[in-house]
Every structure is written in structure tokens, then in C-alpha cells.
């Protein structure tokens, strides 16, 4: 019999399983549900195109929506990030964050999500991401590519605030020149965290 392939290790699944609140015995294996969600994230396939070795797509979607609304997926992400940091010999909490944006060319998304990034000449969507010093994602916000970095940064800082990430002793966030001025003031006022602009040609960068 072929050994099943898992996106998550047994250790990672233990962390995820400990967060699940579904008490009633399920017809489907919850790890397979979790793996199906990982497969969707990895491949970007449509729900209805999930391979048949997973649970029915409607069941997977039901659990995905339930775990999203309950905040389980976000909590699992943060717990897994902390575990990986600890395994790498670092403290679970990071004191330094890094923010940047990335525009992606897309043609099949809705008009509300699509726009033109004037600087990069890309029509599609843009992601604003805050990572820790290991490059692990703390939080991410996606929107149309024509949204200015200043507005996108506020959205991702709001996401950071909603996570109560200030409780993890985040002392500074590094950014490039597109995030100075009003954005730095917004972050300082909202979370009392300084934003340090690092020039791309800085020898220490």
C-alpha cells in the first residue's frame, strides 16, 4: 500500500489538531481535511477539482469556512511559525519585522481585485506582507495592484494589530522608502512600534 503524502509533519499536525474545536465524531479524517486545504493553498486549484483521495470538496470547504470564522487557521499559522522558530534555536517571539509588497500579474480574477501597479507596470493583485527575521509570514493582506503602498501598509498594520502582535514584544519594523512619512506615524500611534526605513543601497542592508 502506498504511504500517504502529507504536507504537514506529525509534529505540525499535533499542533493543528490541538486547536480544533469540533467535538462530534466526524465521518472524515480531520487530518485529510487539513491536508486538502494545504493542497488547495499549494496548487491554487478550484474547490471542485480537489483530487478524489481527499474528502468531497463541499465537506472540505465547510471545514475551511468553519475554521476560518473561528480563527483556528490564523492561530494555527502563528503557532506553527513559533514552533519553527523554536526548532531553529530562536525565541518564539520576534522583536523585528520586515514589511514589503509584491505585485502579481493576473488575468482571471474579478475586477474588484485587479488593478495596475503604476511603478511596476503590472496588472493584477498586490500583497503586503510582514515577515519575521527568518522570512516566516506574520501577516499578509491582498488587494488590487493599483492600491498605493501607504494604504496597503495601513491594512497590514491593522491586521498586525488585530493579532495583538504587540504582545509578542515586536520592537521595530523595517521597510523601504515607500513606507515613510504618514505610514510611520500611523504605526507608531496605533501600536507604539517604530518604522525604520532602510535604503536599498545601504551597505548594511
Regions found by a protein language model. Name each.
Residues 1-205:
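Short alpha-helical elements
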Amino acid at each position: 500500500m502506498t504511504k500517504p503524502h502529507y504536507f504537514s509533519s506529525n509534529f505540525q499536525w499535533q499542533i493543528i489538531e490541538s486547536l480544533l474545536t469540533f467535538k462530534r465524531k466526524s465521518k472524515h479524517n480531520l487530518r485529510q481535511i487539513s491536508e486538502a486545504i494545504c493542497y488547495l493553498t499549494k496548487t491554487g486549484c478550484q474547490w471542485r477539482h480537489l483530487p478524489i483521495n481527499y474528502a468531497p470538496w463541499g465537506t472540505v470547504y465547510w471545514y475551511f469556512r468553519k475554521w476560518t470564522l473561528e480563527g483556528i487557521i490564523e492561530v494555527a499559522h502563528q503557532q506553527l511559525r513559533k514552533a519553527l522558530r523554536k526548532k531553529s534555536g530562536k525565541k518564539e517571539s520576534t522583536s523585528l519585522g520586515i514589511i514589503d509588497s509584491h505585485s502579481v500579474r493576473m488575468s482571471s480574477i474579478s475586477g474588484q481585485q485587479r488593478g495596475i501597479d503604476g511603478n511596476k507596470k503590472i496588472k493584477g493583485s498586490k500583497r503586503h506582507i510582514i515577515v519575521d527575521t527568518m522570512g516566516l509570514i506574520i501577516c499578509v493582506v491582498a488587494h488590487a495592484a493599483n492600491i498605493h503602498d501607504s494604504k496597503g501598509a495601513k491594512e497590514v498594520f491593522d491586521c498586525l494589530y488585530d493579532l495583538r502582535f504587540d504582545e509578542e514584544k515586536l520592537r521595530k519594523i523595517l521597510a523601504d522608502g515607500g513606507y515613510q512619512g504618514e505610514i510611520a506615524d500611523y504605526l507608531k500611534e496605533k501600536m507604539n512600534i517604530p518604522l525604520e526605513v532602510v535604503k536599498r543601497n545601504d551597505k548594511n542592508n
